[in-house]
């Protein structure tokens, strides 16, 4: 074990001197034992010459002094993987933070791993059914694909993520990995308790590096979650869901340490290695012939500017986008997905079939027409519309309400049992509304129901 001495500490960046010929490799983990016996992990970032390396700390550097010993572990940060991490909450270096004692994992993985080779990748494009009508119909997720979840505060990003975890765990007995990157600790705490209550915790591993952590932890915790997910894909051949909340903070953490590492900033002060870092992370999220990692990434958009380098770099990797809208949340329609703003690469008749594609396009057309007519309605009222337009508005309002759905994880708020709607039922329901087969039903019948049969049954009780 090579041992070095700390020579300089600048916030989260620590320089360590090693004896000649014993330099650690780039990305190797070093451990420092503090006075109280706790261990601090440093990750090697640069060789500065003269037997000195520059490292980033994964925890606060309080209490470190020059001359302290740093031991080279000889390999990158290793985290526990396998069935033992399910139902547990870990930090960036794989230590448990749930107070339930050590994780008895038989195997560890490095957080830095090569992306799968070309010949290992699966080329078939498959739709991934979520049981959420608006997603399955208008912006279908692909298995092994990447989805961006764009939304401001309080429009339901976390509830949507919770519902996805719940549906995957119950319907497809799949595993989920949740990586909390630089978000509020309170939200992580809420998520943990909600998962315990809803019973999905046994099929989920949680990894957190929240806002209060130093940038080293926030820049690496997404990789920790990804390694745990990769184990289930490679060694157990599973289809895993990886949730990252929030991918913007991963970039933000990288930009915080970039200047301290002495790199010249690039556009808007971001790190010059922005697209490389994002690419290394995103390239590992993929389907192989063994299994798949499907990711849903919450993306914060600074100052609502989608051309900002951070969200713009993430955009290039996405297969589908789900945009949550405050205007729709204000109407009381949950999930508050904007049906006209959300997109998917696989909404293509060759992949999802003509029936699905045509129904989705018809839904978008009728909603767009309603949107165009809203100004006229606001100024002149409904009476000034032609009979044809009145019919369009009536059907569009039914479609809009039918896009809402009671969630399993929101039963406490809605008082309604959650619904998982199969794709064929979703397509059938919207097709019937658009064809005018339910023009005689009141629009309230379509609000917060699952299938079209439930809407018809609800209409009889109104």
From Swiss-Prot:
Source organism (scientific name): Chlorobaculum tepidum (strain ATCC 49652 / DSM 12025 / NBRC 103806 / TLS) (Chlorobium tepidum)
Stored SMART domains: AAA
Family the UniProt entry places it in: Belongs to the ATPase alpha/beta chains family.
Coiled coil: none
Membrane topology summary: Peripheral membrane protein
Name of the protein described by the UniProt record: ATP synthase subunit beta 2
InterPro entries, per database record: AAA+_ATPase, ATP-synt_VA_C, ATP_synth_F1_bsu, ATPase_a/bsu_AS, ATPase_alpha/beta_chains, ATPase_F1/V1/A1_a/bsu_N, ATPase_F1/V1/A1_a/bsu_N_sf, ATPase_F1/V1/A1_a/bsu_nucl-bd
A UniProt-annotated Pfam family: ATP-synt_VA_C
Subcellular location: Cell inner membrane
Enzyme's top EC category: translocase
Signal peptide: none
Oligomeric and partner information: F-type ATPases have 2 components, CF(1) - the catalytic core - and CF(0) - the membrane proton channel. CF(1) has five subunits: alpha(3), beta(3), gamma(1), delta(1), epsilon(1). CF(0) has three main subunits: a(1), b(2) and c(9-12). The alpha and beta chains form an alternating ring which encloses part of the gamma chain. CF(1) is attached to CF(0) by a central stalk formed by the gamma and epsilon chains, while a peripheral stalk is formed by the delta and b chains.
Domain of life: Bacteria
Gene: atpD2
Gene3D superfamilies listed in its UniProt record: 2.40.10.170, Bovine Mitochondrial F1-atpase, Atp Synthase Beta Chain, Chain D, domain 3 (1.10.1140.10), P-loop containing nucleotide triphosphate hydrolases (3.40.50.300)
Biological function: Produces ATP from ADP in the presence of a proton gradient across the membrane. The catalytic sites are hosted primarily by the beta subunits.
GO cellular component: plasma membrane; proton-transporting ATP synthase complex
